[in-house]
Amino acid sequence: MESGKISVETETLSKTLIKPSSPTPQSLSRYNLSYNDQNIYQTCVSVGFFYENPDGIEISTIREQLQNSLSKTLVSYYPFAGKVVKNDYIHCNDDGIEFVEVRIRCRMNDILKYELRSYARDLVLPKRVTVGSEDTTAIVQLSHFDCGGLAVAFGISHKVADGGTIASFMKDWAASACYLSSSHHVPTPLLVSDSIFPRQDNIICEQFPTSKNCVEKTFIFPPEAIEKLKSKAVEFGIEKPTRVEVLTAFLSRCATVAGKSAAKNNNCGQSLPFPVLQAINLRPILELPQNSVGNLVSIYFSRTIKENDYLNEKEYTKLVINELRKEKQKIKNLSREKLTYVAQMEEFVKSLKEFDISNFLDIDAYLSDSWCRFPFYDVDFGWGKPIWVCLFQPYIKNCVVMMDYPFGDDYGIEAIVSFEQEKMSAFEKNEQLLQFVSN
């Protein structure tokens, strides 16, 4: 493989299936998907964790520790070791999780340079975009580097897990690895998604709408840059702006500028809607613990923003943040039926009809999803915390996912951004953006 000035060889050392250490009882062999799960695409969401050289620990010991603790953890997370059947339920047959071990012929730090991080991510994450009927529901890849550094990556069908579920699973798996020789840690995930959003019969989920022309890049905002954006928002009249709020407004405005620059046709002066959609974790709203398993997510969105509103930075920032705050408050008061992802998408499409728009793909909608505050940087298998955590979700046009990024004892934010090629070329050259990102 090649990327820029680096060429790296990889070798697959082994592939095996890891099954739960105790068989799943027959009474638990069917795990119903929730209505939310049924309407989520069968894509693979992957998270990778890079660790410095665990001094004095043999590779064989690391492999055995990970596999044994994974097997133990799957007793509690037994649906992960099963197969999705007809977009209806998971057959919890203990087929297991695929465990792949890979050798990467380079030093880890050589590919963790900023300009090569997308390449590093592609090397260590499982080579899946969708999860087919013959695939295991989840997959693990353990990668060894020449320097002794390693990466542990976990990928799972989005139909089974959201970001909160993945964070809980990784926390439990790591804790099981640390307490492998004892019974101090017994994972207790809450498998209640179907009781919150009951499954329905004959739900057909369409194929995932990837864009072949999309590219994905990461932009890192150090803590001081985020504080500047928050201070600017306060000057604009926003009370107590959050990190995610100011970055959502800032990045969506930069995206609009880039879109105008890349567009050959400027809509002849017409001001189309420019909705900003925000994903939301429903666990706090539903008063569920964070270890609740499934797709407990939905969206809310701005209703009145037009694409030409970006011309005034102050007014645009106020409009985006205030609109999203208002809509977030509304969603907290909805019934469970109205909280589902599908119900909110239907509401979104309905909101576009006043503009005579029947397909939301015809406009520049912008999706923001925050994985900040998920404790990914606390995932310690017994040899220290990760130095970098990376994420892959299949390319969605005009999408940004935010994650915490460590700066000493503080955290900035890493924004994983996906745009079509021409728009990305304009976006990454935006002078205002470059003032805030770290190299």
Curated annotation (Swiss-Prot):
Catalytic site positions: 158 (proton acceptor), 380 (proton acceptor)
**What's its catalytic activity?**
4-O-deacetylvindoline + acetyl-CoA = vindoline + CoA
Does Nucleus show up as a keyword for this record?
Answer: yes
Query: What are the transmembrane regions?
Result: none
Is the rRNA-binding keyword given for this protein? Answer: no
Q: Which UniProt keywords apply?
A: Acyltransferase, Alkaloid metabolism, Coiled coil, Cytoplasm, Nucleus, Transferase
Q: What does this protein do?
A: Involved in the biosynthesis of vindoline, a precursor of vinblastine and vincristine.
Protein name, UniProt field: Deacetylvindoline O-acetyltransferase
Species this protein is from: Catharanthus roseus (Madagascar periwinkle)
What gene does this protein come from? DAT
